[in-house]
UniProtKB/Swiss-Prot annotation:
Other facts noted in the record for this chain: ADS3.2 does not contribute to the FAD5 phenotype.
Cofactor: Fe(2+)
Residues spanning the membrane: 99-118, 122-139, 246-266
Record protein name field: Probable lipid desaturase ADS3.2, chloroplastic
Organism: Arabidopsis thaliana
Cellular component terms (Gene Ontology): chloroplast membrane
Domain of life where this protein originates: Eukaryota
Motif (Histidine box-1): 140-145
Family per record: Belongs to the fatty acid desaturase type 1 family.
One Pfam family it belongs to: FA_desaturase
Any one GO BP annotation for this protein: unsaturated fatty acid biosynthetic process
Extent of the transit peptide: 1-57
Record remark: domains: The histidine box domains are involved in binding the catalytic metal ions.
Length: 361
């Protein structure tokens, strides 16, 4: 954390952020001015800024060609708009493939009223739950953060379920997420909220070239790349999605395709996206982290515990995100069950000392 000079001036009379130049990178830094913000915002919301120490909670780094910036409503996040348009770039074939899948599932979901059947309808909530578990338990807590270990057969089973959630292969997903934690809320963050709500929510997934340019390749996932199973999934991920869709159509016709693929995938995508967007903008903070991650109770309910995002950013290694007894974390309940029957081992949790060291209160 760094101290903030009292001579710096805020961006505007209502903004708690200060704009200053970084000569080393020739970039602009947006830093939190605790003098004009502590009493007006954090004192009401139990934030982590100390008025006495003038602590900076987070530092945003942006190119100098910033077009405009503003603070998000009811949040301390500053949105930085640059002149580079989303469309003024080259699209890779993988970007186009993801856009086709995204638009296709959403268009398919619009057919739901015309292909309603109770049999297909009841498939929808169960698949949303199963797909969600495979993403939160496997892609996120097991593969991205190694919060616990599973037997290889079970690890691979959950990971394959993540592929069928239409969120890409494990190597790409885990790589992006690890870069998110490494460069959180900076220009190198794959889905920084400083680039706007919709960018952090979903637009970022169609810009793989930018991630490659800002973060690098997949050298941060050597543990997965070394395994033939994950390389196989990376090469064939589209084939699995197509086969999965054809299976639903073969078993239940258009009703099952619409409800089991269209609505299920569209809903699950946006539930996952809420963690990237909403949970870095709105909510409460319990821990002193170098970002604006938030705990959001309603997102936590919808995402099987992922909404306790400030908890997660404070203790990335923790298999449990709902650290309080009242913080519902369905994914953690399943991990505990797997641990109880001997399938989940080396389950990591923060110690009392670690929690006291980061607690705001």
């Amino acid at each position: 954390m760094m101290s903030l000079s009292t001579t710096l001036k805020p961006l505007s009379h209502f903004s708690p952020f200060v704009k200053r130049h970084n000569p080393k990178t020739n970039n602009t830094l947006f830093t939190l001015d605790t003098h004009n913000f502590t009493n007006s915002f954090w004192s009401k919301r139990g934030g982590s800024v100390s008025h006495r120490k003038h602590t900076v909670v987070a530092v945003y780094e942006a190119p100098d060609h910033v077009e405009s910036s503003w603070r998000r409503l009811l949040s301390e996040v500053v949105v930085v708009r640059t002149k580079r348009s989303f469309w003024e770039r080259s699209w890779t074939s993988w970007d186009v493939s993801k856009l086709v899948i995204f638009v296709g599932t959403h268009l398919l979901s619009l057919l739901a009223p015309f292909y309603f059947s109770w049999e297909a309808f009841w498939v929808f909530p169960w698949l949303v739950f199963i797909n969600g578990i495979c993403i939160t338990l496997s892609y996120h807590r097991n593969l991205s953060h190694r919060s616990f270990d599973l037997p290889k057969w079970l690890e691979y089973l959950f990971a394959y379920g993540g592929v069928l959630a239409f969120q890409g292969d494990p190597i790409e997903w885990v790589s992006n997420h690890r870069y998110h934690h490494k460069h959180c809320e900076t220009q190198r963050d794959p889905h920084s909220p400083t680039q706007g709500f919709w960018f952090s929510h979903m637009a970022w997934i169609f810009d793989t070239s930018s991630i490659l340019e800002n973060c690098g390749g997949e050298e941060n996932v050597d543990d997965l790349v070394r395994q033939p199973f994950y390389r196989f999934l990376q090469r064939t991920v589209l084939l699995h999605m197509m086969a999965y869709s054809f299976l639903f159509y073969f078993c239940g016709g258009m009703p099952l395709l619409v409800w089991g693929i269209g609505i299920t995938i569209a809903v699950r995508l946006h539930l996952t996206f809420l963690v990237n967007s909403v949970c870095h903008i709105w909510g409460t903070r319990a821990w002193n982290t170098s970002d604006f991650s938030k705990n959001n109770w309603w997102v936590a309910i919808l995402t099987l515990g992922e909404g306790w995002h400030n908890n997660h950013h404070a203790f990335e290694f923790s298999a449990r995100h709902g650290l309080e007894w009242w913080q519902l974390d369905i994914t953690w309940c399943l991990i505990r069950f797997l641990e109880a029957i001997g399938l989940a081992t080396n389950v990591k949790l923060p110690t009392e000392t670690q929690m006291k060291g980061k607690a705001l209160v």
